[in-house]
Amino acid sequence: LEKTIEMLLTDPDKYFMQLAYKEAQQALSEDEVPIGAIVVVDNKIIGKGYNQVEKLNDVTAHAEMLAITAASNYLGAKFLEECTLYVTLEPCPMCAAALKWARMGRIVYGASDEKGGFTKISNHLLHPKTAISKGVMEEECGAIITNFFKGKR
């Protein structure tokens, strides 16, 4: 517990990315694409999600979308300007657009998505005030998804 509190105080991005990574592991255990997301406000988790596209037969059931919905329901508000989204993989264009409309205050992602990430389309998909940080736990976040797809081939 002491180490957890210390990490939260000294490196909150890594702390919350570890929790997003746990969501990705849950997706992996259900044979879903292993991506996890957490929405945080004032160091409190208010939404979380992992990919459930196969389980729900819903192409929009990405980790970010589920986490945004949970956070909005928790707050009773559609705008998340004071919130930070932690997600293990760079959001796709669909999720980036949803993050724009939700006015997410900050996005922290682990690994870049060289094939389907929003930055491959445009850096202007997000709200102009949204701050972006990347590369938190990049190696672990990249490995879980790379290994998943290697196992599928």
Which residue stretches match the model-derived regions?
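Small-residue (primarily alanine) positions within well-ordered alpha-helices
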Residues: 20, 24-27, 37, 47, ...
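Short loop/turn microsegments at loop-to-beta-strand junctions
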Residues: 12, 33-35
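A short, polar/charged loop-to-alpha-helix boundary motif
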Residues: 55-65
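Short beta->alpha transition motifs characteristic of CBS
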Residues: 46-53, 129
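Short beta-strand scaffold segments in enzyme catalytic cores
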Residues: 35-43
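Zinc-dependent deaminase
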Residues: 1-28, 91-153
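A cytosolic small-molecule/anion-sensing beta-strand core signal
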Residues: 41-42, 69, 81
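Immediate flanking context of iron-sulfur cluster ligation sites
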Residues: 77-89
